[in-house]
Each structure stands twice: as structure tokens, then as C-alpha cells.
Amino acid sequence: MSPVKLSTLAVILGLVFGLPNIYGVLKPAAFGAMLRRFPRYTPVGYVLMLAATAWFLANLKQESISDFAAFKPFLFGLFALVGVGACLFVKDFLPVRGLAVFWLVLAKLMVDTARWVDTDWRLVIVIWAYVWVLGGIWFTVSPWRMRDIINWGTATEQRTRALSGVRLAFGLFVVLLGLTAFRAAEASAVAAQ
């Protein structure tokens, strides 16, 4: 069972994903410059990588698969070393790698939370999670691709504004789903008990 309701998660995800893009719509040049700095801004990379590593380790600690019970302490130490080691020895594109790992653990939460909500609209969250899984895998292996995508997306003010508008609209759509469809599905599940 997920620690958060899908309606709450959708509102949080929609706001966090959408609201920064208001800046991109209003001031595309400044927003584009900020985005172009992201792939090599190492302080953000430390935060993202360590937060994602801690979250992954928390997930591992809660895992109860008996096949891995004997290896769990070893795996815990190994993954902690990998997360910290990435911060120390793989600083090139560390923010991209940290974001990629964060997307992977966030996608797990999204899928786990959406699993039992009885509405087809949950597929919006599930598909979004799988997009993040694919992006997480791809950007972990080839983080320079995010730099290239950001450079393409911010090449002109018009493109930056348009893409920011699309992301803002999607974020608001997810918020709307959280306030309507997901909340209604959760209420009917409670009423049916």
C-alpha cells in the first residue's frame, strides 16, 4: 500500500512539474539560460543523487522478497557506496544522473500509488511513470543527451515559451485529475468498504 493517495500525489506532481514553467512562459530567455546550466551544475547533482540514493535504500529496506533476504545487507552497502561514489568519482553530468535515478524511484511510487485506484485516468500517471523510467535509464547511460535536448528546447525564445506552455498545461491537467477523477475514485472506494 502506498503511503500517499493518488489524488494527493497527482496534485503535488502536477504543481512541481508545471509551476516552474510559468517562468519559462513569462521569461523564456532567462528560463532557457537556467535550464542550459543544469546538466553540469554539480551542487544540484549532489542533492539529487544523494536524495535518490537515500530513497532507493529506504525502498530496499522495506523490501520483503525472501530470495534476497540473505543478500540484503550486502546490497544495502553496495548501493550506498554506488550513490556516494557517483558523487565523488562521476561528477561529469552528475545532475542529469541524479535526476535520472530520482525519476526511477519516483516512478515506482507513482505506479504503486496508481495501481489500486479504480479509474482509467490512472493510466495518465502510469504512462508518465514509464516515460520517466525510460528517460531514467537512457539519461543514466548517456547523460549528454539531456544537454542536447535542453539545448534544442531552448534554442529560441519561441520554442522555450511553447515547450514551457505544454509542460505547464500537462502539469495543470495532472492537478485537475488529482482534484477530480482520482479524488472521486478514492471516495467511491472508501464508500464501497
Please provide the spans of the model-predicted regions.
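N-terminal topogenic module of multi-pass integral membrane proteins
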Residues: 1-54, 191-192
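Helical transmembrane-bundle signal
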Residues: 14-24, 49-59, 80-83, 106-113, ...
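Juxtamembrane "helix-exit" motif on the non-cytosolic side of transmembrane helices
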Residues: 26-30, 58-64, 89-91, 112-118, ...
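Membrane-interface helix-boundary motifs at transmembrane edges
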Residues: 29-41, 64-69, 89-96, 151-154
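Membrane-proximal helix-loop-helix units in multi-pass membrane proteins
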Residues: 67-131, 135, 147
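Transmembrane alpha-helical segments of integral membrane proteins
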Residues: 136-151
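Interfacial loop-to-transmembrane junctions
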Residues: 147-165
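Juxtamembrane boundary at the C-terminal end of a transmembrane helix
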Residues: 173-193
